Regions:
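Bacterial N-terminal signal peptides
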Residues: 5-13
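N-terminal maturation segment of proteins
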Residues: 17-426
């Protein structure tokens, strides 16, 4: 109770810094929302969530301006927002305007991409997500592969040995729904100890097939979300809490709830929409990935999996520590995704070489590597948000203090006010 009271007090303090809407800035924010909706008419999937006035979407879809017209509108809008930022003496207004200007700049570059423009991988990430990813040489991951080799002794290729080891921890398809739902429920219970949510908030689970992603959260507004989990490939027991925390609590569902709160309670119109490609990406995906270690610090993840999820899945809890050790080591390979994506998208290697490198450095089977290559084809530099975004959020939370309560307060502060990646850097 003390923890949630402290966090509630923090939220009130943060929200007190959110000034009453500036009329001029709200007018420009509306223009940004309408611009984004019209971009969505040119690119399916650009608008990830929208819960503003229905007539704005209807108008945008019925009569979208051309991409050339939208570019001119974005340039003019960006200049107007920057003028407000320069003229205002209020810290909260300047922060909001600075954040909104970055959103518009990202949308402007996305329009160039819709028209066929391409930039080198790192520059594309900077222009879309306002974050510079750290790209390490693939050789930096060779020591991690050596550690994993020691964890999974035997003969043959390391990727094959890892696949055989992980196959022991696959959740049977007929138990997947129950296991993932149990994980979601526990992620929610732990999140509610630190973050207040509306009574009507709800998060439902649907199993689907045929997508390049493994899971996706659709935030529908009014504090309601649906997570879709793709079942084309088997899910391992260590995926369950990742799904529950990343897509749900304290990840995308909670992020959506707090963004909608900025819109409805504080009239920050720009938060009525969530474009897929925007500077919110590193914060949302990084925050989602950080959700597991935030909700299950230290050994708590392993303890819950052993006591609750392994029995539900019909797996032996005594084998959980070995699986956890391998999963922890494999997490240290995550940055290799960015290096491979950069080499592939910048034309240094072809798709077949990218798939081979994904198999080698992420220890994936051919089918899973092919699926991830499809994800890179579809979302391009978006992949940085999972890795660089996690580093960003984790670093910010750790600098807030050594204890878990401090990390929760830091995370809540990110959700409760306009925030750009640069705001979270040292």
């Amino acid at each position: 109770m003390r923890a949630i009271a402290a966090v509630a007090a923090l939220a009130m303090a943060l929200m007190s810094c959110v000034t009453k809407p500036a009329p001029d800035l709200n007018r420009l924010a509306e223009s940004y929302v309408r611009l984004s909706l019209e971009i969505g008419a040119h690119e399916d999937g650009y608008v990830d969530a929208y819960y503003g006035p229905a007539e704005w979407r209807t108008q945008a879809m019925a009569h979208p301006r051309s991409t050339a017209e939208l570019k001119r509108a974005a340039d003019a809008l960006h200049a107007q927002i920057e003028a407000i930022e320069s003229a205002s003496a209020e810290t909260a207004v300047k922060r909001r305007a600075h954040t909104l200007a970055a959103y518009v700049a990202s949308a402007r570059f996305r329009l160039d991409m819709i028209d066929g423009a391409r930039a080198p991988f790192v520059q594309e990430a900077q222009l879309l997500f306002a974050l510079t990813p750290e790209i390490k040489p693939l050789t930096a991951y060779d020591p991690v592969l050596a550690r994993i080799d020691a964890l999974v002794p035997g003969h043959g290729e390391l990727s094959g040995r890892v696949a055989a080891f992980r196959a022991r921890y696959v959740i049977p398809p007929d138990k997947l729904q129950a296991v993932v739902q149990a994980a979601i429920d526990e992620c929610r219970r732990r999140t509610l100890q630190h973050i207040a949510l509306q009574r009507n908030e709800r998060f439902t689970l649907l199993l689907v097939t045929g997508h390049s992603w493994g899971a996706y959260n659709y935030y529908h507004g009014d504090n309601q979300s649906q997570i879709q989990v793709d079942t084309d490939l088997p899910s391992n027991i260590d995926d369950a809490l990742q799904l529950g925390c990343h897509e749900g609590y304290p990840g995308h569902h909670v992020q959506g709830v707090y963004a909608e709160r900025l819109y409805r309670r504080y009239r920050y119109v720009e938060y009525s929409i969530a474009p897929l490609f925007s500077p919110q990406g590193p914060i949302n995906e990084g925050g989602g990935n950080y959700g597991v270690e935030l909700a299950f610090p230290g050994a708590e993840k392993l303890a819950f999996e052993q006591s609750r999820l392994y029995p539900l899945a019909g797996l032996d809890p005594a084998t959980a520590p070995a699986a956890e050790a391998l999963a922890a080591a494999m997490n240290d390979l995550a940055g290799a995704r960015l290096t491979i994506a950069q080499q592939y998208l910048d034309g240094r290697i072809d798709r077949e070489a990218a798939v081979a490198l994904l198999q080698h450095y992420l220890l994936q089977g051919r089918e899973r590597a092919e699926k991830y290559a499809r994800f890179i084809d579809q979302y391009r530099s978006y992949v940085i948000n999972y890795v660089s975004g996690l580093d960003l959020i984790r670093g910010y939370a750790n600098r807030a203090g050594p204890d878990n309560d401090a990390h929760w307060r830091a995370y809540l502060s990110i959700l409760s006010q306009p925030t750009l990646p640069a705001d979270l850097e040292p």
